[in-house]
Amino acid sequence: MKKALSIILALVMLLTLVGCSNESGNEGTKPAEGGEAVAQYYNTYMTADPTSMDISRISDSYSSGIVNNVMESLVRMGEVDGNYVIIPGDAQTWESNAEGTVWTFHLGDNTWSDGQPVTAQDYVYSLRRSADPATGCPNEYFLLPVAGYNEVRDGASLETLGVKAIDDKTLEVTLSYPVPSFLEMCCGTVYYPQRQDIVEQYGEQYGSEPQYTLYNGPYSLESWVHNSSITLKKREGYWNADAVQIENVTVNILGDSSTAYTMYEAGQLDYVGTSAAEWVQKFLAREDTDYVKTFSANVNYAFYNTKDALFQNANIRRAFNMAVDRADLNEVTFGGRSNPATGWVTSAMAVGSTNYREYAGDMIAAMYADAEANGMTAKDYLLKGMEELGLGNDPKTLDITFSLAGTDEWFRTYGEYLQQTYNTALGIDLKISFSEWGIFSSNLSTGNYQIGYMGWGAYYNDPYDVLSLFMTENDAISTGWSNAEFDALVLAAQSEMDEAKRLELYKQAETILLLEEYVVNPILFPSSNSFYKNYVQGYVTLAFSSGGYQGMTTGGRQ
């Protein structure tokens, strides 16, 4: 599972990480009234504890949200005048051959948190470690285009992977085929560096605590009190330290969103995100608060364990997909501030200059139109599936549990809504399982569930990012589903240089996913209702920016 957004994710995670920045708005450290400079700091929160700082093993957005600030990638996705642009990270310049299959990255002068220089070999080691089947990297599918990747997965030497250190400051990456979005892929956590000596020194402890991790980014992980708080401190050894204005970041880990709301009101947080109607109105009325609403590249969705005795059946999965009234759910649970999903690929994604969702159309509407044309309801498909499985014709005999990754009041209210929804549409008595993120994630990875509900945030602006999650070799979303035709279409699309052909290949793949196999149930394209104290500047407004806290300022704090 994934960022970053990754890997990976409870519904409310879309409102928990503040973060990415743009390249403008830095005001510096402002002097107080007496003329003395005041160090800038930022107080924020997330709703679950990160699982690890090991970039080869993280999959959830909580972990990747922190890693994005303590690590530096080859390049980052920035914002300039409201548009995406690739900006330097460890690599200050880069170029490719004419075919787009050999990329050369020229590293600048950056250091690790122990003072040693970041080298091209650190990237070689990191990519090899993530590609190694023994590591179990949940995001290794981002390495699929790299030459030798398939051979390594089949047991070949790690040296087979197409990554090479020409010298300490020059990294060469060879691809099996040209990938139009390769630089965007390089912004992801799997392309971050790792120091071999540190990984080997700490073994299984690597990434589990601040002292068992090394950093090359704008911040260091100063403290990590699990399930309580994380403290980040500006790192002077960072290559772009002069541009980092906020000295200290405190990330409170709050299991209950209502605690965040009261902390914001008390001045203990500089940011809060919410979809709760009463709190939105309260925060909108505050004179000390700026409101930012963005439609992200995220999707909230239900998904099925296709190895389950019941949900192995496509008609039963279709019944559950059709039973959800997305517009009603949006109004009841989000106050109408999100958008009903129209596909798996969000409306924020494009292929070149063409918005993918506009090209592919509303596949959820197409599902209902097909059912209407055939005179079928959601319950009809459920009964058809039950007949195919020899389960009789009484939905109340079905034993079904819906798993949610949260235990607070919002999740319990949402669980009640789901029970009513599925009882009305399908006539079933649905059970709800509530658990904290760590337990929920563990159950998914072991296949110990029937239906789950999560949110997923795309790393970069190409449909491959989210469609590849369902490829056979990818266990990011543990559905157990495999389809050779789907795999072939997604792979062909990734390397297709003609935009029109690429669009059509992605559409065909998404059609299999949503209109033939019903493996996943896209429910909402959520908006982010973000509230910042008005002295906070430099936060991002675009979905795929990866700047982190380094471009933010709080210099106007009184």
Please report, for each region that a protein language model flagged, where it lies by residue.
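Surface-exposed binding/hinge segments that line
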Residues: 122-124, 139-197
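Aromatic- and charge-enriched surface segment that lines or borders ligand/interaction sites
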Residues: 92-142, 172, 266, 310-312
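Detector for C-terminal structural segments
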Residues: 323-356, 410-420, 444-558
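Structural transition elements
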Residues: 340-385, 407-412
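Gly/Pro-rich hinge or "lid" segments in bacterial periplasmic/extracellular proteins
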Residues: 61, 79, 175-244, 248, ...
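Ligand/substrate-recognition segments at binding pockets and active sites
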Residues: 226, 375, 380-458, 528
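Ligand-site clamp/hinge motif
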Residues: 202, 237-282
